[in-house]
Amino acid sequence: MTIRTPNELRVAVYDRFWSVAGGGETYAGSIAEILSLDHRVDLIAHEPIDVGTLQERLGLDLSRVRVVVVDDCEPIERVSRAYDLLINATYRDLSPNGARRGISIVHFPHLPTEHLAPWQLRLMGLLHRVARRSIGPVEFDSGFHPADIIRWQQVRWSNGRGVLRVAITPTTTRNLRIAVARFFPDRTDRLVRVKVDGVDVTSFTVVAARNRLQMLRPQIVTVPVTGARGGSIVELLSETFMPDEISGNGDRRRLGIPVVWAGTGAGPISRLLETVSLLGAPRRGFPWLDSYDRIVANSGYGAMWVQRLWNRRCEVLVPAVSQRTGGEKRPIILSVGRFFAPERGHSKKQLEMVGAFARLSAQFPDWELHLVGGCTEQDQPYLDAVRRAAAGLPVVFHIGATGEELDALYSTASIYWHATGLDEDLDADPERAEHFGITTVEAMSAGAVPIVMRAGGQLEIVREGIDGYFFADAEGLLARTRQVIDDDALRGRLGESSVERAKVFDRDSFARRLRIMVDEVLR
């Protein structure tokens, strides 16, 4: 295999969610920024990106990178074949690598079959073996996104014009049976037109699921298809929606209908398979990972769970963290993180922090709690609940704060709180812990004393009693905070140590580790 000299290498950095411009995108963008000094780097995106705007939001220099926009439904494996190295930094992406070399960035590992019991996994394996012989020769030709997992079904969302190619003996007519999942986030029914070889033949309505049973049982549609040379073309035409417009989750794909499977099989076995949604569940294993040369997590915590869940070796590349400037400290406790309810992910626990601060405020009335973070329309009820809990307390909200405002808060804050993972069963759901803790490092770099949850990536940042403290519950949070507030000398010593500790995670350290890793992969 021929690899070009370093200044000729082509590198692709793929992130489906560039427009979100969150922590994951900052991580991916930092990789692109550094590698662009030595290589030709493209950002692979699914919609146009204004590089100037993106680099401003991420706080990076992306002037040397190029943006390559590809269709949502174009397989990344195919797109990446033109590159020497693919770095796939998309959250929960199952795309195989097509480049000469590949690095998979795992923000946190997941199991495609994590919701299945052992008996369901065994049944699933049996069904897949039977299905290969029973559902007939049908392929997803174009207009379908890579596989997604909905509950325990694997589906292929169309983009509004999904094309199936059906291999049937010419002039022979058979019934094509299509299983369509009924999950639509807005619970709106969908009208679908069907064309066969360019001719309108029928239409049907996918009735959105109203309960759990309907969610698990796909809707079966039958379409008569007459064989043609090279295969018959079946088009599924529907209106589309964008998930981000409904749930604010950053998913800006245009989605039509979710197809579980399609086949031309007949007889009792095929009928049985149609009633079992497990047929659409993903197979066990992680075949897409085999196409990558390295698996990389942003913390030792993530790497540990890659080993436990995937049984794969994983390297650690901690994020590059912007170093802030400290100033004159005020009686401020700061916490930075997006506002969203626990049921929507690893919540930053602002509601619990306000509850703890209410008890603290009576003893230390001069101290303030400042909460910084964004909030989508969908998460507004949670923010409203936090505001109600904070009524009458010296709690200041900074929703959508500017970079300058955040810098000023870091500069003056004396203590930094981070409570992600509080009151969670992290053995059962480890993703609810903080995977690393970029904001903790940012606050430390400005001299704030971190008092953070004893879980996840925080354990790799803070040194107990040297830079700050850990807590396991609300009582521990209050006890450590009182200790730091009461002792000015202790607070000063911990703050000075925090500044030095934060330098371990600066950009130069990140760049050095990244270059070593890439050189090893390309060697």
For the regions a protein language model found, what residue spans apply to each?
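Conserved acidic donor-binding segment of nucleotide-sugar-dependent glycosyltransferases
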Residues: 464-475, 483-489
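Short hydrophobic beta-strand element within catalytic cores of glycosyltransferases
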Residues: 440-452
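Nucleotide-activated donor-binding/catalytic signature segment of Leloir-type glycosyltransferases, i.e.
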Residues: 59-62, 373, 383-407
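Active-site donor-binding segments of glycosyltransferases and PAPS-dependent sulfotransferases
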Residues: 38-95, 175, 186, 191, ...
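Short acidic/histidine- and often glycine-rich active-site loop of Leloir-type glycosyltransferases
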Residues: 427, 451-465, 469-470
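Acidic donor-binding loop of glycosyltransferase active sites
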Residues: 411-435, 448
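Membrane-proximal helix-turn-helix segments that form the acceptor-binding/catalytic region
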Residues: 121-134, 268-295
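Conserved catalytic-core segment of nucleotide-activated headgroup transferases in glycan assembly
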Residues: 262, 308-309, 321-324, 329-391
